[in-house]
Amino acid sequence: YNYYQYDDYNFDSCTAKGVCATDPTISSLQEVIIMYLKQLAFYTLKLKKRGVTNKVIKDNIINTLSGLVSNTDYSQEQFKNIIMTIYENLRQSKILYERICKDNNVTAEKLESQLKVDKQLDLNEAIKQGEKEFIRKNKLLTAKQRHLYEIMFVLIKNVCINLIQLNSYNKNCEEAYYSMLHLLNMINYRKVSPDKLKKVIESFTKINYKLIRMLHNIEIETFGIPETVEVSFSTRPHKAVLVSGSNLKELEAVLKATMNTDID
């Protein structure tokens, strides 16, 4: 793989020692998924303007983005299934958009795909395609653009995680979802100036903040105002469940499942 050929790649001692490194194969598959997701964002937004929405596709986009970077334990078969699901969403959305435009005598805007996939997707070919996309990005984008796109992707992932948590309370935020799609769609265009990207990022952070406040208020309504309490750090040999994360509804589910059991 050619990931480390570029001088400005962040290949520090942490990566060199394998502590924080990501398997190049996994990175390639992630690139493929991102390519399909940003194209799917394009057609989802076009369909939204035509009054067409799809909750299944919405859930697929949010769930894929929220777990894409945080979970590198996916097997290659799981990645293949994700790729095929997103590709099928993309294919159907593109066909529907073009049909609606044709029925309304409107010229359909096109977004050319760099990847060609069919029902018999070959995983090795997908890995090669992902590597080519990584190299292509490094050639076409300036260092500043790449860094800004990385910031955008972190924000996109963060919003998706917050949307999933919000959904656990049977709530949603369409403004945050479609703003996230607009941000993801911008990655389709290579000639966006850094200044414009900065303005878009700044605007999106405000929407994300509103989403965080919404989630915080719902948590208070559900569980009450957080209080400072003493927590024992003592341990004992016993059955226990180790939990991590910030989703209080998931924690509640664990506590209910272990209630009146011999588990700490």
Label the model's feature ranges.
Residues 1-264:
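Metallocofactor- and cofactor-centric catalytic cores in central/energy metabolism, strongly enriched
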